[in-house]
Design a protein with these regions (language model features):
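Terminal substrate-recognition subdomain of acyl/acetyltransferases
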Residues: 35, 57-124, 227-285
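Conserved Lys-Pro-Asp/Glu-containing loop-to-beta segment of HAD-superfamily phosphomonoesterases
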Residues: 29-50, 56
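A conserved beta-strand-loop-helix scaffold within acyl/acetyltransferase catalytic domains
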Residues: 129-211
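Short acidic-hydrophobic, aromatic-tinged amphipathic segments that line or gate anion-handling sites
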Residues: 17-21, 65-68, 130-132
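Acyl-donor binding region in acyl/amide transferases
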Residues: 179-182, 188-263
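Short, high-confidence coil segments that cap the C-terminus of an alpha-helix
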Residues: 38-40, 171-172, 231-234
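Short acidic loop-to-helix transition motifs that present clustered carboxylates
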Residues: 22-28, 51, 159-160
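Substrate-recognition/cap helix-loop segment adjacent to the acidic, metal-dependent catalytic center
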Residues: 1-20
């Protein structure tokens, strides 16, 4: 029907993920989340079947399940009145989100055609652009600190004015990363804040969108930050991991990179070699 019906307005290209089958709705929701690489808490479930509504509530309480009235004429007003889709300000990434999800589906399909992860990463032709904060990027950096939960070392939340203040302060470095590959532009998907305390720098904030985790971008980001510290004569670089109920994907990142635990901080000795991923290209702007 979607592909061939002459009166169908929506076509396959308008959907980020399509699950049309007889499978359980909960299973399909999980498949959608996996396919376009988003958290279940980012999904809204709108279904007129009360049994399906209850099933999703029990299986995935983090999914927003909408209570649907019996009268179909009220459906559009319910969606229109949902505050969950409202935002104070749209970033460039927001306007391209549907396109980005479609690209993510293509990446997933491509991944299934290659024999191993290393081959997949090399053939993606990943380019990482590391950018310093500026007035144009501040809204997106703030948005990432407010919304990113999974790969987020400290989960510190910063409003735009706070990011703007850090960006103008010589005792801070604020930056972000834009990630591109053969399928398209993922947009600005990572951010960091470094606090400079004399001869010791501290990684205040370090985060990456869950859509990009596992491609080596996090290693490229941290490698750049550490090299910057080393080039500025810093001998000791500190970082924190503050555990939450959602950031387990970032739990072992610092130790695996070579940091050692000292009291509440993780410390990297900048006399050591700093590793960098070799399957992607890094561009400093």
């Amino acid at each position: 029907v979607i592909r061939d019906h002459p009166d169908m307005i929506l076509r396959e290209k308008h959907f980020a993920s399509i699950q049309i089958n007889w499978n359980d709705k909960a299973q399909n929701l999980k498949q959608i989340a996996d396919e376009i690489n988003i958290g279940l808490s980012s999904i809204v479930f709108f279904d007129d079947d009360k049994l399906n509504q209850e099933r999703i509530k029990q299986e995935f309480p983090e999914v927003l399940t909408i209570e649907i009235p019996n009268d179909p004429s009220q459906y559009s007003s319910i969606l229109t009145n949902l505050n969950d889709f409202n935002v104070l300000q749209k970033t460039e990434e927001d306007t391209k989100r549907g396109e980005m999800y479609a690209q993510q589906r293509q990446r997933k399909q491509f991944e299934n055609t290659v024999s191993n992860l290393d081959q997949f990463l090399k053939q993606l032709d990943i380019k990482v652009k590391i950018k310093k904060s500026n007035e144009f990027l501040i809204p997106r950096i703030s948005q990432l600190t407010l919304k990113t939960n999974q790969f987020n070392l400290t989960t510190r939340r910063y409003q735009e004015e706070e990011i703007r203040k850090f960006s103008k302060d010589e005792n801070f470095t604020v930056g972000c990363v834009q990630v591109l590959d053969k399928f398209g532009d993922n947009g600005v998907t990572g951010a960091y804040v470094v606090k400079k305390n004399g001869t010791s720098w501290i990684l205040d904030t370090f985060l990456l969108s869950c859509r990009i985790i596992g491609r080596g971008v996090e290693d490229a980001m941290l490698s750049h930050i550490l090299k910057d510290a080393k080039n500025n004569g810093i001998k000791e670089f500190k970082a924190e991991f503050i555990p939450t109920s959602k950031n387990k994907p970032a739990e072992n990142f610092l130790s695996e990179f070579g940091f050692e635990k000292q009291d509440k901080f993780w410390v990297y000795n900048l006399n050591n070699n700093i590793k960098s991923p070799n399957h992607l290209m890094v561009e400093i702007e």
